[in-house]
């Protein structure tokens, strides 16, 4: 159940998942972050050696009523692999640092673990961009090559991503941030939906992801049922 946040005091600007997969890039990130993560670390630092632990972390992105029946992907040396089959159309995974924008200073941060669960529409039209970028990263493509290959396509109507894990680590500035749900729509002015306005519970980013607008709504509880902290 979504909550109406009283006075939305954002600790950071709307999260920029690709660069979608969604999420919250802190306004305090700076040249210092870029200096801290100038290049890709060894693959082992991005990997989760315990496969069962990665599956559990991926499922923590959404309530069990959703994630228990979702397909789960885990990171392998060449890309993501199916670790558990699903039957409800949802796909859950733990995104790594390159889920963020190519120019994000934490693009190579090996600490980032972002549990995400996409519904069927999101899994078809939003998730593939991240999976493709993962293959590029693991194949050793340069930033320039990835930037040139990136295609921005409009999301399928109804695309949604759950990010309700209290165990995630989105970046060095915000940690797990807040439990939230993201909605992907066509390019539009956020104010049309009342997003980013004083007192509105809806945050949005459109300029960075044209032709996609990403809406985020903070929810009351983490996926395990514990209460989300107040904003």
What are these regions (language model features)?
Residues 29-38:
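Bacterial Sec-dependent signal peptides at the C-terminal "C-region" and cleavage site
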């Amino acid at each position: 159940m979504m909550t109406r946040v009283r006075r939305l005091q954002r600790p950071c600007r709307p999260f920029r998942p690709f660069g979608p997969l969604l999420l919250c890039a802190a306004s305090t990130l700076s040249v210092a972050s870029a200096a801290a993560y100038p290049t890709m670390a060894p693959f082992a630092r991005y990997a989760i050696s315990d496969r069962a632990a990665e599956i559990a972390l991926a499922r923590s992105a959404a309530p069990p009523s959703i994630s228990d029946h979702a397909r789960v992907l885990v990171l392998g040396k060449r890309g993501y692999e199916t670790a558990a089959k699903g039957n409800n159309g949802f796909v859950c995974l733990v995104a790594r640092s390159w889920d963020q924008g190519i120019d994000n200073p934490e693009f190579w941060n090996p600490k980032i673990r972002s549990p995400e669960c996409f519904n069927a529409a999101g899994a078809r039209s939003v998730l593939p961009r991240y999976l493709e970028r993962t293959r590029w990263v693991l194949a050793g493509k340069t930033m320039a090559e990835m930037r040139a290959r990136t295609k921005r396509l409009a999301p399928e109507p109804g695309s949604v991503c759950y990010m309700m894990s209290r165990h995630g680590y989105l970046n060095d500035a915000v940690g797990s941030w807040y439990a939230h749900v993201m909605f992907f729509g066509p390019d539009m002015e956020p104010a049309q939906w009342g997003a980013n306005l004083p007192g509105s519970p809806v945050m949005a980013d459109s300029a960075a992801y044209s032709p996609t607008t990403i809406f985020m709504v903070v929810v009351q509880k983490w996926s395990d049922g514990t209460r989300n902290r107040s904003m």
